[in-house]
A protein has these predicted regions:
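Signature of uroporphyrinogen-III synthase
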Residues: 1-217
Length: 217
């Protein structure tokens, strides 16, 4: 999770920031079931954490006939899977690119997507239309907190579409500059403003901080 020390180290003393809690993550209890013959999809760090918290045990040994391929969105999600001791067969920067890759290259596989209740429905809409077996399993819930921000800031940075929806409930996007961690989050921001949004590459935190350092002066 991003903290003030990370921001200070990356941006230097010329920047100051506050953190506003816009969402709360609650893991759901899901009884583990057999994953045999399924490929697994993770589109967030929270999905990975909730998956393993529920005791699921994927089989990544490709020598086994029914091993599980793992697909994911974002470098942070890949890193979290590594933390649990699992590699990734294919990494894409957003759900749209992952859906396109699956349609073009993996149409005969069966997929289970472990995600939150507010996950975008890109995969759910696209894969079944191509006769690709897809199942969504909600393993965590995202609660929108709808904060009211009284202080005036020069810029704002968003890290998820749900964070955007929570923030705009009681706040205007009347900032000099708006930053976003990736294209999916940027698409959500543009539903509420026509101002330019500075978008980081590949949903990568370091890339976003570098963008803020360059454009936020």
């Amino acid at each position: 999770m991003l903290n003030e020390k990370q921001v200070s180290e990356k941006l230097g003393n010329g920047f100051s920031c506050d953190f506003v809690e816009v969402i709360k993550i609650n893991h759901k209890e899901v009884r583990p079931f057999d994953l045999e013959n399924y490929s697994l999809i993770f589109t967030s760090v929270n999905g990975v954490d909730a998956f393993f918290a529920n005791g699921f045990k994927p089989d990544e040994n490709f020598m086994d006939k029914h091993f599980n391929k793992i697909y994911c969105v974002g470098k942070k999600t890949k890193a979290r899977l590594r933390k649990y001791g699992f590699g990734v067969f294919k990494l894409k920067k957003n759900a749209k690119e992952l859906s396109e890759f699956i349609v073009e290259n993996c149409a005969k596989e069966r997929f289970i997507h472990f995600c939150g209740n507010l996950a975008l429905d890109i995969l759910q809409k696209k894969l079944p239309l191509q006769n690709i077996e897809y199942r969504k399993v909600v393993v965590y819930e995202t609660e929108l907190l709808y904060p009211k921000v009284e202080h005036q800031y020069d810029a704002v940075a968003f890290f998820s579409p749900s964070g955007v929806r929570s923030f705009v409930q009681h706040n205007l996007l009347n900032f000099s500059k708006i930053f976003s961690i990736g294209e999916t989050t940027t698409s959500e921001i543009y539903k509420f403003t026509d101002k330019e949004v500075f978008t980081g590459k590949d949903n990568d935190l370091a890339a976003l901080l570098q963008l803020i350092k360059v454009e936020g002066k």
